[in-house]
Amino acid sequence: MYGQNIPRAQFGNRGFGQSGSSSSRRGCGGARLLIGLAMAAFALISYFGSSVYNPITGKDQHINITAEQEVALGLQSAPEMAQQFGGLHPDEQARARVAEIGERIVANSAAAHSQYPFKFHLLADPQTVNAFALPGGQIFITEALYSRLQTEGQLAGVLGHEVGHVVGRHSAEHIAKQQLTQGLTGAVVLSTYDPGDPSSQRTAQIAMVIGQLVNMKFGREDELESDHLGVRFIGEAGYDPRALIGVMRILEEASSGGRPPEFFSTHPNSDTRIAEIEEAIQKQYPGGVPEGLRP
């Protein structure tokens, strides 16, 4: 597409001669390569030079914003996100129930030791089956999903999963990973692109596709980690973690078989998630899930 904006005839009609034009292109190509290498080095140093230990997940993460910045981002985005899904649900009792269960999960789990002021919202959208978390602790569930849940434990499972995204700092990780992949993709595009060589356009396109697929992979890994954290958190709060399996069945039914192939999705398919949840339950409760947990 760039070549269409700068017709090659313009470069061949200035009296420089063929050899001069080739030398000029080689010189420009060398400069582009050096700049591209510098861009790639900066992206790599910025990413791998920012390492933070997460005491709740027990892993080091590459993150370049603070928890306070996450909270500010979430608070800034919350009103607009709520508006996109019809605003807050008019039923105050239903909103209070969501908030109560969410706060119980936070208060009775490892999430209580995080830096985030959690707040739980029920949105009015009756069509979109969804729940999501913004950076810093703003958590939302739509009426379309809320109305499909059959037990309190299933609602706890949805909210616990979203709490997992927050304490897992997945949004902050994603920001850093996007900056890395964009920096590396930009470096490849800059260093390989040549308006006179159509194959360089294909190289640039391939680099961008690879960057997108890498970010999708990160998204799937985040979902699986949040499932594991959800099992842990709702169990700590007194709910039966097997309720999360029921949530997966509900989501699968709501998708009506219209999901994309797993490789091209930011969410793993339901079978994969159910297997991961069962594995997490076995790890959390090697002697079996105890009696008396809320279903």
Ranges and model annotations:
Residues 2-295:
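A Zn2+-metalloprotease active-site environment signal
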